[in-house]
Regions:
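FAD-binding subdomain of flavoenzyme oxidoreductases
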Residues: 121-276, 500-507
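Conserved, mostly hydrophobic/aromatic
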Residues: 86, 226, 480
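C-terminal substrate-recognition/cap domain of FAD-linked oxidoreductases
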Residues: 37-53, 240, 251, 257-434, ...
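Activity-critical C-terminal alpha-helical subdomain
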Residues: 201, 452-507
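Conserved phosphate/anionic-ligand binding catalytic regions in large, soluble enzymes, centered on
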Residues: 101-106, 170-171, 217-232, 401-405, ...
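Alpha-helix capping/hinge segments and adjacent helical runs
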Residues: 32-36, 433, 440-452, 477-485
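N-terminal flexible segment immediately upstream of the FAD-binding catalytic core
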Residues: 1-84, 102-131, 282-290, 335-360, ...
Length: 507
């Protein structure tokens, strides 16, 4: 597939009822009949992820959730037994957790088995002295955080999708959370992992992330989107709940001055727990709807936290000086507090987009040298990709910062897309293609933390280069030679393979 081709949104034809029943019977011997679904019930109960692609295909009667059977293991041993069976029968397996992704990665487009990990929710070990915790992959992030908060602790990885996202899903997509600027993304939280390979081997990786015992294999599976192995548990770092939080908000004359303020903070060691910079359109038409503060242009919200108020105040003071040095005007701190209290309203009606709209939130990373050019090129490419008569809006903010750069969140929205599915996909794909290629050409990386999924798979070779893709394919072949795990995801389909191999499971 050329990197400019539309992603494949086809779903494999379902197994015959006989084959699906036979596969379900084999799985029931492993899990028990109450934890196996097949046929239309398997698809009805598990409709797919939260991407626009999933919603619009379902609306038009062409759903992307093509699983023939759903299997719900409760233990690592059961996961291993399911994978052994699947490998023997050459049946595709797609692991899934909360299905909160927005790229289509958790959709079982090749049919076969959807491995529902949501029953694996145990906290296996909590070490209060080392501030580490071993938790199973099906645990929902919000539930985990609430359990920790009751003990004065925090995971500090808290994505916008925390109410639905599973720990394993965050690991699979290399996710990020609202506090990442200080506490890091999921890769910084994960210390070790338990992984089941496609042949059923269970790998328990070293319990410490810093060692000289060869490569750090845990990180091989972070961001692998289920293609290399099934992560069944992870050991993660924890923190104490902060005793103090301090908010501030600033109005900049333009986005470039705001980016420079953020760069100066990050490169001087100042670490806000939250730093969100909104361009004019996002400040006026998104943030303002939540905080009601009369915002009229580029706005930055920052939050500092910690156990020692003197240190929190000192960092906030340095931030104030840096922002003032970039010409910013300080706004009332209640704006930041209002955002914090309402930070999840954006994901519910009336704030969240709904069909018949077309929407997509991209997340593109770049270093500080290139981030402004990436912002300009990507947002311009989005606007130029479609006729103005569609009334598309583009609203952008920067919310995950690093000591080397940041990322942009440009969300495009079209109030009403075409009634025809293929025409709607053409419109959506034209915008995504233009923005993705513009990001690459400007020196950016096409995704920061939402993952690749179906939407970005055609562009992986352009991002990695031919040699990089050959390396990734060699890793895939070494760990999953039969391509049982998520075939085709991460552009890792073997040559000549269709949407799903022909499978006739044994009765």
């Amino acid at each position: 597939m050329s990197f400019t081709d539309r992603p494949s949104y086809r779903t494999a034809a379902p197994m015959t009822d006989f084959d699906a029943r036979a596969l379900a019977a084999s799985l029931a011997e492993i899990l028990g009949p109450d934890r196996v679904l097949h046929g239309s019930e398997a698809r009805r109960r598990h409709p797919g992820d939260m991407s626009w692609l999933t919603y619009v295909h379902a609306q038009h009667g062409r759903p992307l959730n093509g699983q023939d059977v759903v299997a719900s293991p409760r233990s690592t041993r059961e996961v291993a037994d399911v994978l052994k069976l699947a490998t023997r029968l050459k049946v595709p397996v797609t692991p899934a957790g909360g299905a909160s992704g927005v790229q289509g990665a958790a959709n079982a487009t090749c049919g076969g088995i959807l491995l529902d990990l949501r029953s694996m929710t145990r906290v296996r070990n909590l070490d209060r002295r080392s501030l580490t915790c071993t938790v199973e992959a099906g645990m929902i992030v919000k539930t985990f955080e609430e359990q920790l908060n009751a003990q004065g602790l925090s995971f500090t990885h808290y994505p916008a999708s925390a109410e639905w996202a599973s720990i394993g899903g965050c690991v699979a997509a290399r996710g990020s959370g609202v506090l990442s600027t200080k506490y890091g993304t999921i890769q910084d939280h994960v210390l070790s992992a338990e992984v089941v390979l496609s042949d059923g081997d269970v790998v328990q990786l070293p319990a410490l992330p810093r060692h000289g015992v060869g490569p750090e294999l845990t990180q091989l599976f972070v961001g692998s989107e289920g293609t290399l192995g099934v992560v069944t548990a992870v050991t993660v770092r924890l923190r104490h709940l902060p005793a103090h939080r301090k908010f501030a908000a600033y109005r900049f004359d333009d986005l470039a001055r705001g980016i420079e303020a953020g760069r100066r903070m990050m490169t001087s060691g100042v670490r806000p727990a939250v730093m969100r910079l909104y361009d004019r359109e996002a400040a006026i038409h998104s943030l303002e709807r939540a905080v009601t503060a009369g915002l009229d242009g580029e706005t930055m919200i920052v939050m500092f936290d910690g156990d020692h108020p003197t240190l929190v105040d000192a960092e906030a003071a340095v931030c104030r000086d840096i922002c003032a040095g970039e010409g910013a005007r300080e706004l009332r701190p209640g704006i930041g507090e209002a955002w914090w209290d309402k930070r999840y309203v954006f994901y519910y009606p009336p704030h969240a987009p709904q069909l018949p709209q077309i929407w997509c939130t991209m997340d593109v990373a770049a270093d500080f040298t290139r981030i402004e050019a990436v912002y300009r090129n990507v947002t311009r490419a989005m606007r130029e990709a479609v006729d103005p008569s569609w009334g598309m809006t583009v609203k952008t903010h920067l919310s995950h910062w690093y000591d080397w750069g940041s990322m942009i969140y440009p969300r495009f929205g079209i109030p009403k897309g075409p009634d025809d599915l293929d025409a709607a996909l053409d419109l959506h794909d034209a915008i995504v293609r233009a923005a993705t290629l513009a990001a690459i050409e400007a020196g950016g990386v096409i995704n920061d933390h939402h993952g690749v999924g179906m939407r970005l798979a055609p562009y992986l070779e352009r991002q990695f280069g031919p040699a990089g893709m050959r390396l990734l394919r060699r890793i895939k072949h070494g760990l999953d030679p039969d391509h049982v795990l998520c075939p085709g995801k991460l552009a890792l389909r073997p040559e000549g393979q269709g949407e799903r191999p022909t499978v006739t499971p044994a009765a």
